Amino acid sequence: MLKLNLEGIYNFLDWHNYAQTFAPQIKVIHQKLHQDQQLKEKYLGWLELPLHFDFQELEKMKQLKNSHPNLDVLVVIGIGGSYLGAKAGIEFLQTPFKKTKPEILFAGHQASGNYLTNLLHYLKDKNWAINVISKSGITLEPALAFRILKKEIEEKYGKQLAKNRIFVTTDSQKGVLLNLALKEGYQTFVIPDSVGGRFSVFTSVGILPFVFANLDVVSMMKGALQAYHDTFQEDLFQNQAYQYALARYLLHTQQNKKMELLVSYEPHLLSFSEWWKQLFAESEGKEEKGLFVGATNNSTDLHSLGQFIQEGTKMLFETVLNVTSIKDDCVVPHIPNELDNLNYVAGKTYSQINQKILQATKQAHIEGKVPNLEIVIPTLDAYHFGYLAYFFQKACAMSGSLLGINPFNQPGVEIYKQKMFALLKS
């Protein structure tokens, strides 16, 4: 189970005093999140998803996958929350060195013609299908990618057969993509109207790619459900998600920290960190408020960003994701008459070495005046992916509410789009 370790901030904050002070406010925010019907209907469709997960819809997705037994590749088209959750879950749970069928590839998450051209070349001799994800259907990058991939798949299989290889995840009532899907006769799945993209990982947005990737969705939702129950506590002292939210809020407002780094020590967590960045940046970065969020993957980044973190501007704090047990591990062999001077670690596993690196780094950074939060999970499995993703969603809702902003909208992203469309149409 997840454990939050706050010891790395005690030298910087009178945590216990602040916690007593903010506990009543957190209780009020919790009650608003769970009882404000208007708020729930507009923004909080994700809040009780683990409680009311649609297992019939899951079976429908499994049947769809089973109807394509020889599929080599599923191309998931989406950007932002329409792909980050799926990519995070798949990379959290699968090794890049063991190719499973179908392989899940992504498109429409940038505007690179080079990427798309090479993807099309890769698909030439593959048996493939498309899952296009967009609530509106007008987001430029996925819409363009879908236009090109749709043309390609229709040329390869013919229009009639191609329509059975295109799965659309979109709004249930309106939108360009829904209209196109209905006209063409594509299989559709629903993005709930009250669920924003960055909170959509447990909807069909994430679940359909997870099914095609052969992930254990049932265990994942058990983890999310346990996180729902654990974070349903209105008492700050019984709710680790709220403690994390308050800690980062206090480091920002009382210690003037401008940036939070999510620090991981497993490559499997790289895409999870990208998902986390969108969750917090898009939720909190408004009204000239909020922390800038970034991520590092150690020990790799200790050899690049480590110098700045240790001795640079004291603008940041770290949240360390500590995975204490790894299923696949490697033992350092003992070599007689060693020439590489490494027998001092002979017999140790890489996990044991990684843990020592983590502990040493945390200690050094705290001594270097960099506060550290630590979130500990026992392993990388479907259950803990579900738990961790829901934990951060709930923490984000509380953290943004403490800032006094609406954590569930994103008005700022429309500004560049307006200018972009004006330039493209001029």
From Swiss-Prot:
Entry's Gene Ontology cellular component terms: cytosol
Q: Indicate whether Cytoplasm appears among the record's keywords.
A: yes
Which GO annotations describe the biological process of this protein? gluconeogenesis; glucose 6-phosphate metabolic process; glycolytic process
Q: Can the keyword Transferase be found in this entry's annotation?
A: no
Q: What class of enzyme is it?
A: isomerase
Q: Which UniProt keywords apply?
A: Cytoplasm, Gluconeogenesis, Glycolysis, Isomerase
The UniProt entry lists the main location of this chain as cytoplasm
* EC number of the protein: 5.3.1.9
Q: In which pathway does it act?
A: Carbohydrate biosynthesis; gluconeogenesis; Carbohydrate degradation; glycolysis; D-glyceraldehyde 3-phosphate and glycerone phosphate from D-glucose: step 2/4
Q: Where is the active site?
A: E282 (proton donor), H303, K417
What catalytic activity is recorded? alpha-D-glucose 6-phosphate = beta-D-fructose 6-phosphate
Provide the GO MF annotations for this entry: carbohydrate derivative binding; glucose-6-phosphate isomerase activity; monosaccharide binding
- Compartmental location: Cytoplasm
Q: Domain of life, per the record?
A: Bacteria
Which family does the entry's similarity section mention?
Belongs to the GPI family.
Instruction: Report the protein's function.
Output: Catalyzes the reversible isomerization of glucose-6-phosphate to fructose-6-phosphate.
UniProt protein name? Glucose-6-phosphate isomerase
Which gene underlies this protein?
A: pgi
